[in-house]
Amino acid sequence: MSADFTDFKVADLSLAEFGRKEITLAEHEMPGLMSIRREYAEAQPLAGARVTGSLHMTVQTAVLIETLVALGAQVRWASCNIFSTQGHAAAAIAVGPDGTPDNPRAVPVFAWKGETLEEYWWCTEQALTWPDSPTGGPNMILDDGGDATLLVHKGVEYEKDGKVPSVDTAENDEHRVILELLNRTITDGSQKWTQLASEIRGVTEETTTGVHRLYEMQRDGVLLFPAINVNDAVTKSKFDNKYGCRHSLIDGINRATDVLIGGKTAVVFGYGDVGKAARSLRGQGARVIVTEIDPICALQAAMDGYQVTTLDEVVDKADIFITTTGNKDIIMAADMARMKHQAIVGNIGHFDNEIDMAGLAKVPGIVKDEIKPQVHTWTFPDGKKIIVLSEGRLLNLGNATGHPSFVMSNSFADQTLAQIELFTKPGDYPTGVYTLPKHLDEKVARLHLDALGVKLTTLRPEQASYIGVDVDGPYKSDHYRY
């Protein structure tokens, strides 16, 4: 990279040294990624890969980015959330291990904390723009929430239609910004997005929300390239979603509010892998109530000792409300109007539409006041206030620093192996949505055992034969529920 490298946008390059120190600490806590670097360094399986990343620009993500680069990839990056970027991590990635703030020499990264919606989608566009590539774009996408994948698909769709819908048809502010971006980039006869998509070998998707989008596109017959659903890898969903959320949910609430959780009543919406972080609230001494639509998850919650009921039954009684569903319109403005004075409202699902922030802003006479970044009170005309964290977006990343490095090593090892799988074996993956092969899922788990002092028992050949598996695995069928 030349000394005049300016293909990036971060808040403050002077934070790079601090970021580099934190990255070094994180590497020690991320044995999976570091083992993959050592194993594949010589083979360079991602040589020739142009990876566009749209994933929270944190210290842990910095270790992922530098792992992809160590395996031969070129990388361009944006965050997948307007509040989740850690400025020192972004600066360290832009500067690189061998650069300085005056001479940055590393990865084009476009991310800073507190982006506007226009800035956020501009950053996503920049991450997808590869000036010197044959198609002007990437040949791989690493996504979290599906925004980079969505932008490519919408661009191709509207080029095929010959026009972009009017911004007057936008469903919300974010949709309006997307339409404005595509109106700007799609001119008469333009095939920018179609050309960009033509060389993409696949996408690896990190989270439930993005996976839902992929399955919808597959169902509708519009998916343009193969995808690996990393979210449903066991070493992701049963570790990142479970153990990570237990840690970062409490961290976010504590940093945002400094309230004592013990003795309070908390409502957790959803009891899937993320919602099971309810356990951490209980561990702090809260009385936890769960809402559910799924009878199986509701039964699990009840047998784990939680009261399971509807929001309507408890909306005026609880102190803390946390959405975890990945769905929309979970808490509406009318619900928030019924809450107790200074009730805390937050989300660890994904997008900001789990909580009706648009509806809240339209309540006649309501007043929004910033207490500190990503902590706002909303005062209703009767004087009652509620506290909303991260403007309804991910509180564990907006108000805190996300999941710990060790658990993210699992998820990001999954991502790295999924990228290698799609990039090196395109013939094995026709367009569709796939899960990470079981042997790779087990490999990721193995890479983390030594750090915890785990010693595995080894099957004898006759034992393996008896249960119909190989001595070295995989040990479970794809449909086994851990």
UniProtKB/Swiss-Prot annotation:
GO terms for cellular component: cytosol. This is Adenosylhomocysteinase. It holds the Pfam family AdoHcyase_NAD. It comes from the Bacteria. May play a key role in the regulation of the intracellular concentration of adenosylhomocysteine. It catalyses: S-adenosyl-L-homocysteine + H2O = L-homocysteine + adenosine. The keyword Cell membrane does not apply. Its main location: cytoplasm. Binds 1 NAD(+) per subunit. Keywords: Cytoplasm, Hydrolase, NAD, One-carbon metabolism. PANTHER family: ADENOSYLHOMOCYSTEINASE. InterPro entries: Adenosylhomocyst_ase-like_sf, Adenosylhomocysteinase-like, Ado_hCys_hydrolase_NAD-bd, NAD(P)-bd_dom_sf, S-Ado-L-homoCys_hydrolase_CS. It comes from Streptomyces argillaceus. The gene is ahcY. Belongs to the adenosylhomocysteinase family. Substrate binds at residues 58, 144, 206, 236, 240. It is found in: Cytoplasm. Its EC number is 3.13.2.1. GO terms for molecular function: adenosylhomocysteinase activity.
